[in-house]
């Protein structure tokens, strides 16, 4: 670990954080940079502040008061130890020997007794974690993702590869020139052996360098991906309500393309401009006709590349809506199979899915055929130019304008020139893709919090009033003129399709439209923000096909908070605690059990007892549903009316149905 020396007595804490960040994250913080990161108090940092600021540097710090023996038993490589008015980092080197990294004195060793004399008894463990994410926008995007040191390293790797290629060309020229008088057979054998050895070394070194480059790239990619995904933990409800899961998973593609632009395309541009200038000059000095061939080859390669790029861009624009349609229909089909039994709708959705699949397959086939055709044309053009160079070279040898050695040399560097010059044109396409991915990443970072500007504060209602409410169920059926006073514990019934579930869903405030007024006590439902309703209104359906295992529900945590032994007995009698896979009835019991610690919420239960055995329903109601009414507002949709205590606790929606 490299020491960062403090310049003032109060800087030991920040220096310790910088040393650990440099060691665990391979950062390169210097003293002055650390002071820019934190507004350092005059008294220095405390353990609490070390824990807080440590997250900024990607450090998970936990402090303890403990003995030396307990310190020895802690897991970890490095520990922060508190001396009187001073912090140091220690590392257990041997059983009775500690290596100390002191921002005031440097590195030194202490045995147990020496450490014990200076130590105050307070220490902290240090673990590597993801760094906190600062706000990212278009103005500071470049700063967050551009790493000059990595770009310099990648340019250095490219220079090594080019140097090897140039050395190979020069060596070939030298070998042919020095063996041309030994006879044709000897000349060929020497050249082939020497060429294969050099080519083998080149390929081996090229593979190693590319491996190093790929390892560094994917290490950086994984770090940034974890760094970005950590932001999801701090995002608001509004953020997730406005972002689809597909948008969140797209981050990986956008991130990879952005990092490729900085770490691949920018170094390639720097190298390509340099190589094109130097080698183009060399070719022009030696023979202009080869330079013109190279220029024509570059133009042809660029034309093929641009055709492929714009074709792919156009076909991708066609593919996006088809893919979105395919995903949308797949979700609808999944809902049909899980929540409905509607053969006509199933057949319609399958027809739509088949159409989308066929169109997507046709688009994929077009892209594949186009890529194959482009590669074929490019390969053919390369062969044509190779034969043209060879023909000009043979003519030049016959006319004694240059030697065989020069032909091999010019052949090698001309190929290098055309390859790198073509990359300059390809950089334009990379810029186009970078701009697109950058904008997408910035958009995904944005978190609009205007939803939090709600008009009223949440309070659990005692009554929900519906005044002249009308709800459209489908094109032929409405719930009209609903004037209802819904009270805690009330059960809603009615024939199938009478709008029971729709009414509960409207009370969630999640976008279903209605006419009229719905009031929670004296407050209008529309006055609450979507975030407030999401956190305070619970809607549970009996259709729980997505969950199979008790670990999906956080079962262990809920058990710790359960105080009623009869509930324990219910869980044991229904076999929930020892089941690997849960039945539908067990899932319903479990989801009701997990609600037990809720307070001041509106809980909407949509047929959450329909899969439970008939003999168990009264017991489940008494132990899991009725207690919810003590601290919450509960509404139930049920066909089984044995739980209704009086007519005042029952609402039948069937009389409100109207044909339209």
From Swiss-Prot:
GO biological process: proteolysis
GO terms, molecular function: ATP binding; ATP hydrolysis activity; ATPase-coupled transmembrane transporter activity; cysteine-type peptidase activity
Membrane topology summary: Multi-pass membrane protein
Residue ranges of domain Peptidase C39 in the record: 6-126
GO cellular component: ATP-binding cassette (ABC) transporter complex
Record Pfam families: ABC_tran, Peptidase_C39
Active site feature: 12
Chain sites annotated for binding ATP: 494-501
Keywords of the record: ATP-binding, Cell membrane, Hydrolase, Membrane, Nucleotide-binding, Protease, Thiol protease, Transmembrane, Transmembrane helix, Transport
Gene3D superfamilies the UniProt entry points to: Cysteine proteinases (3.90.70.10), P-loop containing nucleotide triphosphate hydrolases (3.40.50.300)
Protein's UniProt keywords contain Iron: no
Domain ABC transporter: 464-660
Similarity field: Belongs to the ABC transporter superfamily.
Protein name: Putative ABC transporter ATP-binding MG390 homolog
């Amino acid at each position: 670990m490299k020491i960062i020396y403090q310049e003032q007595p109060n800087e030991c804490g920040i220096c310790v954080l910088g040393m650990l960040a440099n060691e665990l994250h391979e950062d390169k913080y210097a003293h002055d940079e650390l002071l820019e990161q934190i507004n350092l108090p005059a008294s220095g940092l405390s353990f609490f502040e070390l824990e807080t600021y440590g997250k900024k540097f990607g450090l998970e710090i936990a402090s303890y008061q403990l003995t030396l023996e307990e310190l020895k038993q802690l897991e970890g490589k490095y520990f922060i130890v508190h001396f009187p008015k001073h912090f140091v980092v220690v590392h257990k080197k041997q059983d009775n020997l500690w290596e100390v990294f002191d921002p005031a004195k440097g590195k030194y060793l202490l045995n147990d007794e020496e450490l014990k004399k200076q130590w105050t008894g307070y220490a902290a463990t240090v673990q590597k974690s993801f760094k906190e994410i600062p706000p990212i926008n278009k103005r500071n995007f470049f700063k967050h993702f551009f790493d000059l040191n990595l770009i310099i390293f990648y340019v250095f790797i490219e220079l090594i590869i080019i140097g090897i290629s140039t050395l190979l060309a020069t060596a070939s020229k030298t070998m042919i020139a020095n063996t041309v008088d030994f006879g044709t057979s000897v000349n060929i054998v020497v050249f082939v052996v020497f060429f294969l050895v050099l080519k083998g070394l080149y390929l081996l070194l090229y593979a190693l360098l590319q491996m190093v480059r790929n390892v560094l790239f994917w290490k950086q990619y994984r770090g940034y991906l974890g760094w970005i995904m950590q932001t999801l933990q701090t995002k608001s409800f509004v953020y997730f309500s406005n972002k689809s899961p597909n948008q969140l998973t797209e981050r990986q593609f956008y991130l990879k393309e952005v990092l490729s632009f900085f770490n691949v395309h920018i170094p390639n541009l720097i190298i390509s401009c340099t190589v094109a200038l130097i080698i183009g000059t060399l070719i022009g000095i030696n023979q202009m006709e080869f330079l013109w061939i190279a220029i024509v080859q570059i133009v042809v390669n660029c034309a093929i590349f641009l055709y492929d790029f714009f074709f792919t861009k156009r076909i991708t624009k066609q593919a996006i809506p088809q893919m979105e349609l395919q995903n949308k229909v797949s979700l609808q089909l999944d809902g049909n199979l899980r929540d409905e039994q509607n053969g006509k709708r199933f057949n319609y959705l399958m027809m739509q899915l088949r159409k989308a699949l066929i169109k997507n397959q046709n688009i994929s086939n077009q892209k594949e055929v186009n890529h194959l055709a482009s590669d074929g044309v490019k390969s053919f053009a390369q062969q044509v130019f190779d034969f043209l160079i060879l023909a000009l070279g043979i003519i030049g040898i016959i006319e004694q304008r240059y030697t065989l050695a020069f032909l091999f040399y010019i052949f090698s560097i001309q190929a290098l020139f055309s390859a790198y010059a073509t990359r300059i044109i390809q950089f334009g396409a990379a810029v186009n893709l970078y701009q697109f991915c950058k904008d997408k990443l910035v958009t995904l970072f944005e978190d609009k919090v205007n939803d939090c500007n709600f008009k009223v504060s949440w309070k659990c209602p005692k009554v929900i009033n519906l005044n002249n409410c009308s709800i459209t169920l489908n094109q032929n059926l409405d719930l009209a003129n609903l004037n209802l006073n819904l009270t805690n514990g009330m059960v809603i019934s009615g024939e199938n399709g009478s709008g029971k579930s729709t009414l509960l869903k409207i009370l969630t405030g999640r976008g279903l439209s209605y006419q009229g007024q719905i009031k929670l006590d004296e407050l209008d439902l529309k006055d609450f923000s979507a975030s407030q309703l999401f956190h305070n209104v619970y809607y549970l359906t009996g259709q729980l096909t997505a969950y199979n295992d008790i670990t999906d529900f956080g079962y262990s945590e809920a058990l710790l908070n359960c105080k009623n032994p009869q509930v324990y007995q219910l869980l044991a009698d229904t076999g929930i605690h020892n089941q690997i896979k849960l039945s539908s009835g067990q899932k319903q019991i479990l989801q009701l059990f997990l609600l037990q610690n809720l307070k001041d919420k509106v809980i909407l239960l949509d047929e959450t007892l329909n899969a439970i055995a008939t003999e168990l329903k009264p017991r489940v109601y008494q132990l899991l549903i009725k207690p919810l009414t003590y601290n919450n507002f509960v509404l139930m949709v049920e066909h089984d009316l044995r739980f209704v205590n009086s007519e005042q606790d029952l609402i039948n929606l069937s009389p409100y149905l109207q044909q339209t």
